[in-house]
Amino acid sequence: MRAVLTRVKSASVTIDGEVVGKIGKGFLILLGVGPNDTEKECRYLAEKALGLRIFEDENGKMNLGLDAIDGEVLVVSQFTLYGNCRKGRRPSFTDAAGPELGNALYEKFLAICEELGYPPQHGEFGADMQVESINDGPVTLILDTEQLMNEPRRS
């Protein structure tokens, strides 16, 4: 499972001209699901993302989490995070999960966010969406469970 997490001052997602999700200060999470992902990766990624302390404290140091700033979360499904650009000029998306698994784990991710105390605003799986954000910093992180869950911890 992959996420591109951006610290934002605000963000919104629009479908067919209607804003369906909107947040103030918090995290915009673009979420991609791989074909071998399970609920285990989903829970790990949600807990990791929502626990990050990437907001500045009074000393300007990245030390505060969502809870400390009363932050919000906007989650948007993004199968193109599994785009493969190795051959040719047009990306292949065969490395992404199929729609059934992708939607199931996207919905599970949303449920876990809520369970963790951050009811997310969100887009619609498979829809054509327009996403607007005012990035803060900018601070953008790429989280990939294949790397995070399998690499030995550095001391």
Predicted regions and their residues:
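RNA/tRNA-interacting regions in translation and RNA-turnover enzymes
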Residues: 11
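Compact, glycine-rich, soluble single-domain proteins
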Residues: 18-70, 80-111, 115-116, 121
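Residue-level signal for inorganic ion chemistry
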Residues: 45, 76, 139
